[in-house]
Structures are given as structure tokens and as C-alpha cells.
């Protein structure tokens, strides 16, 4: 029986991880963080329960990676939306609107994410977080910053503060008010990005997030092996010659060669 190639094994592992990320986002959004167990996430993903701990140290780290994925893919989608723009101010407006919309549409996820960042262990350095930092750093650079290493953390802090203010139980601030302050800070025109009046603020919230996770059908096995779940799906760790596939940004640095939160 001929073994699968290393590239096929890596693709299977990548998709297994994608399913876990998607399952974490779905379940925490539906049930809340405390009511969601790692076993629940594994079951929703169709994976062996032991596989979760192979990819992630714990539930908090898994959720942070999942929300960072949701955030960076949301930003990518906003920046690539037609008509595409290379204008730095328009791109900054789209980033601000995308993050504020996440706070509006996914309050349970974003509130738990903010709470997790304040834990003693701090944020999780993962491929999804690195990609998010790269997008924000690139946005700051295209906006015209001459000091990205200083202006990137400020943008991050302002966005986090806006999300926090929008989600404080009992006394949340309105998204248009927060948007106005951020737009004033960056000297953006109200018509840029996606103004609140362009989509009803009390309209339906987006709930289908599956497009942000690459969970396509697994590649077919070779002719001498019956198709089925991969070794990774059964909880079998990779062999010495086929280590876990890493995202291309996992060991990368953000703009300016510095790792970012």
C-alpha cells in the first residue's frame, strides 16, 4: 500500500485545522465560551478529540486564533471589495468599518476575544494573528505613515478601544459615534468606506462565516489506498519527515521586521 505524499498529508492537516477554527467560531457564537468544550468543537469539526490539543494548547488559544482568522479575512474582504482602491485614506476607512461591523455583528465572539486578551497569558502569537498585524501595518503604511512601528500600535489600540466601547454591557456606545471619532482622528471623509447609513444598522446580522475557512473536500487518496479521513483526522501526529504544515506567515514578521501583537 503506497503512502500518501507529504504534500497531501500537509493539505489534510491544514484542512483539519481549518475545521477546528470554524467550529470554534460557530459554537462560541451560538452557546458562549463557557458552555463550549473542546470536545464539542472536535465533534462539530468531525475530528478526533485529541487532535485539538495537537494544534492548540487550549480552548482560549484556539478561540483567539479563530477570531484572529475572522478578523484578518474580514479585513481582506473589505480591502478587496469592488471597486478596489489603492488610496490610503479609503483603505483606512474600510479597515475601521470592517472592525466596527464585526463588533456589531459578532458581539459574543468579539467580547470574549477582548476578555481573552486581558488574561495573564496575553495574546496568542499564531499565523492568523501575524496576518492580521501585516494587514494593519500595510494599511498604516499606505495611509502615509512615516513611522509605521509607532503608528501601527496606535491604530491597533484605537480599534480595540472602539470595540470595547461598543460591547460594554449596559452602556455600549453607538457604532456611528465611534466611527465619527476614528474618522476624525484619521481625517477621513464620512462617505469613505461603508457609511452606517449604507446598511441598515438594525438590519440582519451576518451569521454565515464559512467562507472565511478553507474547508474544501479532502484530496482523493492514491489508487492503492481507499479514500477516507486522513491520519490527522484520526489524531495521528505527523511523522518525522512530514511535519505539520505551517502557514506562510507563521514565522514571518510584520512590516518593519518586528513581530506584533
Question: Can you say where each PLM-predicted feature lies in the sequence?
Answer:
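Residues at secondary-structure transition points
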Residues: 7-15, 57, 61, 65, ...
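Amphipathic C-terminal alpha-helical segment
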Residues: 102-105, 109, 115, 119, ...
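Amphipathic alpha-helical packing segments from all-alpha helical-bundle domains
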Residues: 75-76, 102-105, 119-154, 176-183
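N-terminal intrinsically disordered/low-complexity leader segments
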Residues: 1-15, 192-261
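Generic hydrophobic, amphipathic alpha-helix propensity
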Residues: 12, 16-25, 41, 62, ...
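Solvent-exposed, amphipathic alpha-helical segments
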Residues: 19, 23-30, 77-84, 158-166
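Hydrophobic alpha-helical connector segments
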Residues: 65, 79-108, 155, 179, ...
Amino acid at each position: 500500500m503506497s503512502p500518501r505524499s507529504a504534500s497531501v498529508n500537509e493539505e489534510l492537516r491544514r484542512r483539519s485545522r481549518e475545521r477546528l477554527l470554524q467550529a470554534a467560531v460557530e459554537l462560541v457564537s451560538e452557546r458562549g465560551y463557557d458552555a463550549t468544550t473542546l470536545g464539542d468543537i472536535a465533534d462539530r469539526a468531525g475530528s478526533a478529540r485529541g487532535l485539538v490539543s495537537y494544534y492548540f494548547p487550549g480552548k482560549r488559544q484556539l478561540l483567539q486564533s479563530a477570531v484572529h482568522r475572522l478578523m484578518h479575512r474580514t479585513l481582506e474582504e473589505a480591502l478587496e471589495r469592488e471597486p478596489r482602491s489603492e488610496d490610503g485614506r479609503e483603505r483606512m476607512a474600510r479597515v475601521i468599518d470592517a472592525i466596527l461591523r464585526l463588533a456589531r455583528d459578532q458581539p459574543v465572539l468579539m467580547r470574549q476575544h477582548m476578555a481573552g486578551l486581558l488574561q495573564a497569558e496575553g495574546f496568542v502569537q499564531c499565523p492568523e494573528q501575524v496576518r492580521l498585524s501585516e494587514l494593519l501595518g500595510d494599511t498604516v503604511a499606505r495611509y502615509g505613515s512615516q513611522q509605521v512601528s509607532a503608528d501601527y500600535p496606535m491604530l491597533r489600540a484605537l480599534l480595540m478601544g472602539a470595540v470595547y466601547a461598543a460591547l460594554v454591557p449596559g452602556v455600549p456606545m453607538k457604532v456611528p459615534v465611534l466611527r465619527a471619532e476614528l474618522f476624525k482622528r484619521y481625517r477621513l471623509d464620512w462617505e469613505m468606506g461603508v457609511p452606517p447609513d449604507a446598511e441598515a444598522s438594525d438590519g440582519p446580522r451576518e451569521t454565515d462565516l464559512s467562507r472565511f475557512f478553507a474547508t474544501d473536500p479532502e484530496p482523493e487518496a492514491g489508487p492503492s489506498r481507499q479514500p477516507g479521513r486522513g491520519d490527522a483526522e484520526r489524531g495521528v501526529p505527523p511523522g518525522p519527515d512530514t511535519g505539520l504544515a505551517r502557514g506562510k506567515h507563521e514565522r514571518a514578521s510584520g512590516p518593519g521586521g518586528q513581530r506584533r501583537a
